[in-house]
């Protein structure tokens, strides 16, 4: 994710539809003009994430605060960090669902992303396939031939493969072997040989679908993480009960602007 700070209740990013190819200007004639327009708007709704625990007045009185407090504080930090990982992964977990549309009105991974020209574009295969040599090559070809809304080739490249734990061994064989996997042919592994996924693969333990996998691309303004309020902690006593209460709180949002940031499959 690209991390950015925010000072508002939400953030909106308007995508720009650029210009077409520049035409030849005949001698003595005026230059041609083109119009750049605004595309769809991606919206990031910040969420407040907070959790607290309390120690009784008696526990504090019996000098248990130092022993229990430090352990509870570490557990609280783990809970906050785990929640953030889940929310970050949910952008991919919900990538195929129409219930979580992006700024263009369709799911993050879709076969019919609408373009300003009236055409549609896809960041998935027409038929989902399991992770294998062919599906990797097809995805990398699809990524490299993506165009912008005006039909200009933007020469995207895949950066890394993101897989759940269930696919880590398949991914390792496919991206670590110098030769083709599962064949007796003495052919090179073209993906490895050309360095087409420079960051290799990464295992995301928070992905829900054991068959789904994703290719992150190098398009700008893709996945974004907005920090509205960094992690803050506070400690106070409760007058009525005498308990000591410890709270952790932060505000942030995860999302995406340009859907070309990823290509993916749910598996066959």
Where are these regions (language model features)?
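Assembly/oligomerization interface modules of large self-assembling protein complexes
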Residues: 1-49
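Solvent-exposed, flexible loop/coil residues
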Residues: 5, 37, 48, 59, ...
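Short alpha-helical interface patches
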Residues: 18-20, 29-34, 49, 55-64, ...
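Solvent-exposed, non-transmembrane amphipathic alpha-helical segments
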Residues: 21, 73, 89-96, 100, ...
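Long, contiguous amphipathic alpha-helices that act as assembly "spine/axial" helices in icosahedral shell
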Residues: 41-99, 161, 246-248
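Flexible, active-site-adjacent loop/turn segments at secondary-structure boundaries
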Residues: 42-47, 58, 98, 106, ...
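Alpha-helical scaffold segments that mediate packing/assembly in large oligomeric complexes
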Residues: 66-71, 78-142
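Sequence/fold signature of self-assembling virion shell proteins
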Residues: 109-149, 155-160, 166-268
């Amino acid at each position: 994710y690209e991390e950015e700070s925010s000072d508002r209740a939400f953030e909106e990013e308007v995508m720009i539809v650029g210009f077409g190819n520049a035409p030849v200007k005949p001698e003595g004639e005026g230059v041609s003009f083109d119009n750049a327009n605004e595309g769809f708007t991606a919206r990031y709704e910040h969420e407040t994430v907070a959790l607290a625990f309390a120690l009784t007045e008696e526990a504090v009185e019996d000098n248990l605060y130092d022993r229990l407090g430090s352990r509870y504080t570490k557990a609280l930090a783990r809970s906050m960090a785990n929640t953030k990982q889940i929310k970050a992964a949910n952008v991919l977990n919900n990538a195929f669902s129409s219930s979580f549309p992006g700024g263009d009105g369709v799911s993050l991974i879709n076969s019919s992303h609408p373009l300003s020209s009236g055409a549609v574009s896809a960041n998935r295969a027409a038929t989902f396939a399991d992770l294998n040599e062919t599906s990797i090559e097809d995805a990398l070809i699809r990524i490299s031939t993506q165009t912008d809304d005006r039909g200009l080739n933007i020469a995207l490249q895949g950066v890394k493969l993101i897989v759940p734990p269930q696919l880590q061994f398949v991914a390792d064989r496919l991206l670590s072997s110098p030769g083709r996997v599962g064949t007796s042919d003495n052919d090179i592994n073209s993906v490895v040989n050309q360095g087409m996924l420079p960051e290799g693969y990464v295992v995301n333990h928070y992905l829900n679908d054991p068959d789904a996998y994703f290719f992150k691309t190098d398009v700008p303004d893709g996945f974004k993480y907005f920090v509205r309020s960094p992690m803050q902690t506070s400690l106070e006593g409760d007058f009525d009960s005498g308990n000591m209460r410890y709270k952790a709180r932060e505000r942030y949002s995860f999302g995406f602007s340009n859907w070309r940031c990823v290509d993916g499959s749910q598996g066959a």
